[in-house]
């Protein structure tokens, strides 16, 4: 079920739950402090006039569009249009301006894990219900939901999923997923506010925002 609702955004503070994939299964580990407690009103007051860079929500996202954050929230932060391709859908995730948005990132405490000799890279985003990115892969990292819920679908590196790179995750879920035999289905989970998912190196994954969601990833390496 998908929801478009920002009520309660910023109200979740406390501790977050770290989850990971180990030996092909999801596991849960330690709790550690959650650090971003912020409302949409506060974000708009501080950053509404600041430009953000949007990407298309497809596997190979080449198109970039810059516009003020306030304009994105007012005009584009809507549920996913079922008739639109991922290559036609603009999505705010990554390409962050760490200078202009520095006060936000300074409030964030990443998961206390890293690859020795490297520094993690942050990607912050806000997106509407039903949006997401279709299957792709990259290096390892952590994904945390601050507000809303994000559903994940994952395959190990050696198992390439059946998908179209320019179609949305929502269309894949409706048109392809129901017809996959059980042995062809991905691992999947839904992460909620204060939960953190570790995604391993080169694992295929697709995401689907079940609500209007605020999220941040820490890419390792």
Sequence positions of predicted segments:
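N-terminal accessory scaffold of Fe(II)-dependent oxygenases
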Residues: 1-6, 11-196, 204-221
């Amino acid at each position: 079920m998908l929801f478009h609702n920002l009520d309660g955004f910023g109200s979740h503070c406390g501790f977050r739950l770290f989850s990971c994939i180990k030996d092909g299964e999801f596991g849960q580990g330690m709790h550690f402090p959650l650090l971003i407690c912020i409302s949409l009103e506060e974000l708009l007051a501080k950053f509404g006039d600041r430009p953000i860079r949007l990407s298309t929500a497809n596997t190979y996202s080449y198109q970039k569009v810059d516009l003020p954050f306030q304009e994105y929230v007012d005009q584009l932060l809507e549920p996913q249009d079922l008739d639109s391709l991922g290559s036609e859908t603009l999505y705010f995730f990554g390409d962050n301006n760490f200078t202009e948005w520095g006060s936000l990132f300074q409030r964030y405490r990443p998961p206390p894990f890293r690859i020795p000799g490297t520094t993690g890279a942050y990607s912050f985003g806000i997106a509407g219900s039903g949006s997401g990115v279709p299957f792709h892969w990259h290096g390892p990292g952590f994904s945390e939901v601050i507000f809303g819920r994000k559903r994940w679908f994952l395959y190990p590196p050696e198992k390439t999923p059946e998908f179209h790179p320019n179609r949305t995750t929502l269309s894949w879920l409706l048109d392809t997923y129901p017809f996959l035999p059980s042995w062809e289905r991905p691992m999947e989970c839904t992460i909620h506010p204060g939960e953190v998912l570790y995604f391993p190196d080169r694992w295929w994954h697709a995401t689907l925002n079940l609500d209007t969601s605020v999220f941040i990833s820490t890419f390792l390496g």
